[in-house]
Amino acid sequence: MSEMTYKDAGVDIDKEAFAVRAIRDVLEKYKVEPEGCREVEGIGHYAAVLEVHGELLTLNVDGVGSKVLVAQLVGRYDTVGIDAIAMNANDAVCLGARPLAFLDYLAMEDPDPDVCAEIAEGLGKGAREAGAPIVGGELATLPEVIRGKEEGRGFDLVVACLGRVEGDPITGEDVEPGDAIVGLRSSGIHSNGLTLARKVLLSEYDVHDELPHGRTVAEELLEPTRIYVRPVMEVLRDYEVRGIAHITGGGVENLKRLRDDVRYVLDDPFEPHPVFEIIRELGNVPVEEMYRTFNMGMGMALIVPEEEAEDVVDTVSKHVEAKIVGHVEEGRGVVVHMDGHEVKL
């Protein structure tokens, strides 16, 4: 296969950034501030932060992207709900917020009760792991809008999250050179880069085929996104955390969402999961593209004072694999050292 990028697969993240900027610029003209409600952090971060009568609340919304297509191909629907909750819960904790409640929006080509029940199973499991209930939602039947890989099976799934911050929100502005970067291991691909992963893997394998490392394509593509609420909340209780990055769309470049005037050096990153190397080799995907598309083994990063880093690792490791993956220094961008190679982003 000739060299393939996320853009070649149909997703242009640079174009997306311009589109978001266009939306944000228009919405700025219509901004209102209700009595008793003040915007503390707005469009651009992982979640908005609102001060409502003295309480700091967060709001965010996200979906699971083209992972729904894999669910349709496989005929398995009980995992994508976990992803939908995870994407939102993990974004909320990046501001230091504990999720309070979720809403879901399910748009379907045909509202099959059995499929809906499977999707709800995943939503329920995810919400329980995140420690907050699903308090409402919307089911829309849109046969002219939603088209599936399998006739009648098309759907899209979106979740919104309400959270609460105790103390000051964590925006990343306190990150400084000398800080340590603690990485939290991902469970796999999670919910970003699925379009590229799916197109590369399915160019060579059937969705039920076994990959060289023993897992099937379906298992890798549908592996649920890990939910990091519990370990992060425990760390926030006992240690100073200066920035939290959910490694989603854009890969490790998400670190730059915290402060973009410092350099994040990953000199001891996690070994990527085997599926990432298969995608890279099979799709002839440049290493730089891999790190700006996928999480490459790290689902979340905590920026903490260097002297607290080992204790933070010990705390997180009670829940999920963690280690010090790098540090912050003077400069700009993200640098990854992997197998003797240096990747600059």
Curated annotation (Swiss-Prot):
EC number: 6.3.3.1
Top EC class for this record: ligase
Protein name: Phosphoribosylformylglycinamidine cyclo-ligase
BP GO annotations: 'de novo' IMP biosynthetic process; adenine biosynthetic process
GO molecular function list: ATP binding; phosphoribosylamine-glycine ligase activity; phosphoribosylformylglycinamidine cyclo-ligase activity
Family per record: Belongs to the AIR synthase family.
Pathway: Purine metabolism; IMP biosynthesis via de novo pathway; 5-amino-1-(5-phospho-D-ribosyl)imidazole from N(2)-formyl-N(1)-(5-phospho-D-ribosyl)glycinamide: step 2/2
Catalytic activity: 2-formamido-N(1)-(5-O-phospho-beta-D-ribosyl)acetamidine + ATP = 5-amino-1-(5-phospho-beta-D-ribosyl)imidazole + ADP + phosphate + H(+)
Native source species: Methanopyrus kandleri (strain AV19 / DSM 6324 / JCM 9639 / NBRC 100938)
GO cellular component terms, semicolon-separated: cytosol
Main location: cytoplasm
UniProt keywords, alphabetically: ATP-binding, Cytoplasm, Ligase, Nucleotide-binding, Purine biosynthesis
UniProt subcellular location: Cytoplasm
InterPro entries registered for this protein in UniProt: PurM-like_C_dom (IPR010918), PurM-like_C_sf (IPR036676), PurM-like_N (IPR016188), PurM-like_N_sf (IPR036921), PurM_cligase (IPR004733)
PANTHER family: TRIFUNCTIONAL PURINE BIOSYNTHETIC PROTEIN ADENOSINE-3, TRIFUNCTIONAL PURINE BIOSYNTHETIC PROTEIN ADENOSINE-3-RELATED
